[in-house]
A protein has these predicted regions:
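Active-site-proximal beta-strand/loop segments in catalytic clefts of secreted hydrolases
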Residues: 87-89, 113-117, 140-141, 177-181, ...
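Residue-level detector of anion-binding/catalytic polar loops
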Residues: 109, 135, 197, 204, ...
Length: 282
């Protein structure tokens, strides 16, 4: 019969092994899917920013455990003061004309992430967005929960959307934003391998919440502005007609320059750090 002696060294080794096993189990539960928006059925436009802090924390734990997670671009490391206004469009278009007129008034460009069914319903608006120099990204064809899709289903969503977009403006997209802000490794890897950059945001107006006043939105957004920031708004945001002009005027007054996502992203070889910041690789 073999006799095992529990020395201090053995106990430490066993404890480390147990800790790694527990951490792996926790990560499997916490990090497998990142769901960051409320149910679309209850909100006119979802809020994908609710748990960004938890996502980053989970990502750092995954790196520690050797289970590194993929991240989209939340912001860009820039020495200049370029920032990007992004507008998700999936419901209605009654405020889109106001948004475009406001952007024209201040001579700035934005990036619109459209859903395929929205683009099909409002092709003239899509044409105007493109004609006025704004960038258009892929927000999927049907606004599904991407974490629940297979790689092929993800690719089908991307292709169906771009087929719709191309039929309207003769162009396909190179940027992608996930519905509900949801993503996992498979979503990001599949989308990037298909030739898109995955774009999130570091500043959320949360303008889909009807109870948020324009003042509340501005007081939340403006102090967070920094070079390379990506702002999330919605084309049908409740208070967008009240807050957007002030947001733009204030940012311009602070020396910021609004550009499209394509102009904001860095050229050359880049990395995305644990906070989702795109940086030069060297």
């Amino acid at each position: 019969m073999k006799v095992f002696v529990l020395t201090k060294k053995n106990l430490i080794a066993a404890g480390l092994i147990l800790a790694v096993i527990i951490l792996a189990v926790v990560l499997a539960i916490v990090c497998s899917d990142r769901s960051t928006e409320p149910n679309v059925g209850t909100d006119p436009s979802p809020d994908p920013n609710a748990q960004i802090g938890n996502e980053v924390e989970s990502y750092e734990l995954a790196v520690f455990a050797g289970l590194q997670k993929e991240l989209p671009v939340y912001s860009v490391s820039r020495e200049d003061k370029k920032i990007a206004l992004t507008i998700d469009a999936a419901w209605a278009d009654d405020k889109t004309e106001f948004i475009l007129e406001t952007l024209n008034k201040y001579n700035i460009k934005a990036t619109f992430f459209l859903c395929g069914f929205w683009a099909e319903k409002y092709p003239d608006i899509v044409k105007r967005i493109d004609a006025e120099g704004h960038q258009i990204g892929n927000h999927t064809a049907t606004h599904p929960h991407m974490n629940k899709l297979s790689s092929q289903q993800i690719l089908d969503e991307l292709k169906k959307y771009d087929d719709i977009l191309e039929s309207i403006i003769g162009k396909r997209s190179t940027l992608f934003r996930a519905p509900y802000g949801e993503y996992n490794d498979n979503v990001i890897t599949t989308v990037r391998n298909a030739g898109y950059e995955v774009i999130q945001w570091d500043i959320d107006t949360v303008d889909w919440r009807e109870e948020r006043s324009a003042e509340t939105i501005l007081n939340s957004v403006l102090p967070k502005l920094k070079p390379g920031s990506i702002i999330l708004s919605h084309n049908n945001g409740f208070k967008i007609e009240q807050y957007l002009p002030t947001l733009i005027e204030t940012a311009l007054g602070q020396g910021y320059e609004f550009v499209t996502i394509g102009e904001l992203l860095l050229d050359g070889t880049t990395i995305i750090d644990v906070n989702g910041v795109q940086k030069p690789a060297n």
